[in-house]
Amino acid sequence: MSAQSVEEDSILIIPTPDEEEKILRVKLEEDPDGEEGSSIPWNHLPDPEIFRQRFRQFGYQDSPGPREAVSQLRELCRLWLRPETHTKEQILELVVLEQFVAILPKELQTWVRDHHPENGEEAVTVLEDLESELDDPGQPVSLRRRKREVLVEDMVSQEEAQGLPSSELDAVENQLKWASWELHSLRHCDDDGRTENGALAPKQELPSAVESHEVPGTLNMGVPQIFKYGETCFPKGRFERKRNPSRKKQHICDECGKHFSQGSALILHQRIHSGEKPYGCVECGKAFSRSSILVQHQRVHTGEKPYKCLECGKAFSQNSGLINHQRIHTGEKPYECVQCGKSYSQSSNLFRHXXRHNAXKLLNVVKV
């Protein structure tokens, strides 16, 4: 993937750009060749995500010459990956995490980044938790529907906070549903939307709280075409579309002038400028932008495991852990490699397996 495509697919709006520029300018002036010894203390640097973005967005025109360009890229990469404090395995995991997030649909990228995963496994857990929230067969239909609507409303607020056009916001619920299907990769069907046993997949209904619109430049979730993720495919025209062109945006950000239709979305957006993370862990001091993320994090300290397997009694701190564990009893392996046909019970294992295929291809190219 080129640096330009990564930039287009994975750019986040970053906080306090003036402070970031100042820190980078001082750092590069003190240590233009990227030598150790004159570095700013690591605990005084901004979030590594800032430097990852600068590394990916850096242009040749930003430097006076090729030597300076290489030097600045090297320094930005060091500030992102921080080899002084990270092991080789941690650095590798950061690169894998970046690529994994970059290949996700835009809405899922936002969802994952908002949970601040530190490695690929945590990112997978975030997506599997979302999947289980959207489709938990053990809950009454009315409760599942309400939880789905709450998740959609929450997701819309996050998307608005990133300043996306309103036409893209209305496709969020569809994207979340597709995310659930993509993660499972359970169904195999033909171009008519039939499953392996020949039955038509049931038509999905949209919650009335969210209207579906076409999304310019992305997959049209209003009238979907056949979309394959591994061996999973989805039928054409399965969603009913509604429009609400009268949507208004009455809340304005004083910092950048962006408009929002919800006051809560404006509050979330303003944290981009302030860098605010109001939900702090009293045990370790780690801060989060959302209370739900803090609740999940606190289970690391408390040892709480509210999700219990009915087969063997083993308990887990997150629902996704229970779902993965239950596949030991059922033998279910829903994640299949399209290149060799090998199946896995967890999507993270399939992701690692696919990386080996890609690594083998890269080695063959290098040998040639």
Curated annotation (Swiss-Prot):
GO terms for molecular function: DNA-binding transcription factor activity, RNA polymerase II-specific; RNA polymerase II cis-regulatory region sequence-specific DNA binding; sequence-specific DNA binding; zinc ion binding. Residues 52-134 form the SCAN box domain. The gene is ZNF24. The keyword Ubl conjugation applies. A zinc finger (C2H2-type) spans 251-273, 279-301, 307-329, 335-357. GO terms for biological process: myelination; regulation of transcription by RNA polymerase II. Belongs to the krueppel C2H2-type zinc-finger protein family. Keywords: DNA-binding, Isopeptide bond, Metal-binding, Nucleus, Phosphoprotein, Repeat, Repressor, Transcription, Transcription regulation, Ubl conjugation, Zinc, Zinc-finger. Sumoylated. The lineage of its organism: Eukaryota, Metazoa, Chordata, Craniata, Vertebrata. It is found in: Nucleus. The modification Phosphoserine is found at residues 132, 142, 274, 292. The modification Phosphotyrosine is found at residue 335. There is a cross-link at residues 22, 27, 147, 177, 236, 277, 286, 361, 367 (Glycyl lysine isopeptide (Lys-Gly) (interchain with G-Cter in SUMO2)). Its main location: nucleus. The keyword Aminoacyl-tRNA synthetase does not apply. GO terms for cellular component: nucleus. Residues 251-301 are annotated as: Necessary and sufficient for nuclear localization. This is Zinc finger protein 24. There is a cross-link at residue 27 (Glycyl lysine isopeptide (Lys-Gly) (interchain with G-Cter in SUMO1)). InterPro entries: SCAN_dom, SCAN_sf, Znf_C2H2_sf, Znf_C2H2_type. PANTHER family: KRUEPPEL-LIKE TRANSCRIPTION FACTOR, ZINC FINGER PROTEIN 384. Transcription factor required for myelination of differentiated oligodendrocytes. Required for the conversion of oligodendrocytes from the premyelinating to the myelinating state. In the developing central nervous system (CNS), involved in the maintenance in the progenitor stage by promoting the cell cycle. Specifically binds to the 5'-TCAT-3' DNA sequence. Has transcription repressor activity in vitro. Pfam families: SCAN, zf-C2H2.
